[in-house]
Amino acid sequence: MIAEQNRQKGLYWTPRGGNNARDIWASCHLFTSVTENKRTGDTETTTVIVDMGQHEAPWLFANGEYDKVVPALDDCLAVKGLSKPENPASAVFLTHCHSDHTTGIFEYLQMGTEIPPVYGSRYTLNALQKGLIDLKIPSEKWPEMKCVKTGDSIRIGNLTVDVFPASHSVPGCFSFRLSNGEASIFHSGDTKADETSFLGRGVDVSSYKRIGRNGGVDLMTFDSTAVHLKGHATSEAEIFETYREIFEQNAGRQIIAPLSAAHMERLASVVCAAAAAGKNVVINGGASMEKNVLALKTAGYDLHAKCPNIQIVGAKGAAKLDPETCVTVTTGNYAEPNSPFVRCLRGEKNGFVLRPDAVVIAPTSGDKNEKLLSVLEKSGLDGLKLITGIEKPRVYGSGHAQADDFVKIANSVRPRMVAPIHCFKERADVLNALAAKNGFMTLPEYPHNGTTVVVSGRTGVRIESVKSPEWFGIRHETDSKGNVKTSFVKVADGGYSTDYDKEAGIARRQKEAMKKIAGYRFAAARKRGFIAERRGGDGR
């Protein structure tokens, strides 16, 4: 955070995680509002945190010494055993429920930290509560949780936070506009310009245009994960149509649809496509998918009410339905070992219903299918047919904005300057070039973690300071009675493995080799009819 002395009126933004040197994990951003009380002349300061994620690859940190790694926030949170911050954060706002945006909260609570009130959608807060219960964190230590919805305007001290819908891979995603009368920032969160959703609504471009018509914003911090890709991210409506077509072309066959356990937007699209094709649905993706489906229900999303013409059952109900009338939504697209589908393919008698001539839809393509293809071939079920992202590209869609998504949103919000988030430097450079091409100003350098940007009506947008980011490395040790002891230490950003570049080079060469192997295998599999042809066939 910015030092109290000599503070200029305005809004301060500091990424603490997500704008990493080499990856996108641990999203966490500080926003500090500095204004003058017109009655007393005193300086008033309010800080909020947007997202508190953890790093998804702790083994790359300090040679794998720690179980968990989170951005160091002891300058705005009262961490047990450390000095209390001068200006503690007043609130936490969550853009969505993914672990790289939320589960730092779990770690800080286990470190003995008091977390200020947490604001999020009903779905996001339900997922947060489920995680707290699973970790057996006592309820008296939980932060206060405040459910907000699209269109809400929340006043925190001298800062106003307005809530806008975002489109990602889960329901209840938000973008936020933060303003204080001196300056304004639009924070996209993870998003794309998809206005379609089978769980309510996608983004609301009309609300973005209202921002633009009312003067725009001074700065837009924008999801840059996939801006290097041309065009728009595939919409849920396009994905729905592709699945519906496949289901109708294979009306008399069982269909297996592996998905990510957490991608509930995609699950809803697939279920609705099945209903449109008159196919019943079995949801059998293991414990993780079951938890997410339950979270949908408790947040008020009712797939049964949305698709009353079909039966939607869980794993236990599968045996009561004719497999040929069903789409089984499961996990295992990356051959995850705990997937019920993958365990069945490997010969385990786990009750997973699988016809020997089923159609398997693997939404990714190339080397990303290599593991699943290997499991399928070893299963000995030669009657299975595989449809991948090669044959049907629109069975997959990223939850992140591509180039045209950025242009559409930026032209609606009309920021005076754009800054990249959720990316590493190379991807940030792509966003900056794209922004400049479309007439938007950019910062002179990559705002990596620890960079503080000040937005002021007097001086515009500029980099205030650049500091080396710090992290907490955390260990959880369980004693013989099952009690968990948590310890932590602050580590500099340089604590990331010095072998990272070497590891990345090895991984890159392995990926290139896997692509070649995948190409050979796919060619051989297609030759013997294991994989459907892309053109001219009926998808069987």
Map each language-model feature to its residues.
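Well-formed, non-transmembrane alpha-helical positions, independent of function
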Residues: 107, 408-409
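Short, structured interface segments
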Residues: 218, 388-390
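Non-Sec secretion/translocation targeting segments of pathogen effectors
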Residues: 506, 511-540
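His/Asp/Glu-rich metal-coordinating catalytic cores
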Residues: 2-36, 41-91, 98-276, 280-286, ...
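Hard-cation-handling environments
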Residues: 229-363, 368-386, 395, 405, ...
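A donor-sugar binding/catalytic signature common to diverse glycosyltransferases
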Residues: 416
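Short beta->alpha junction loops
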Residues: 391-400
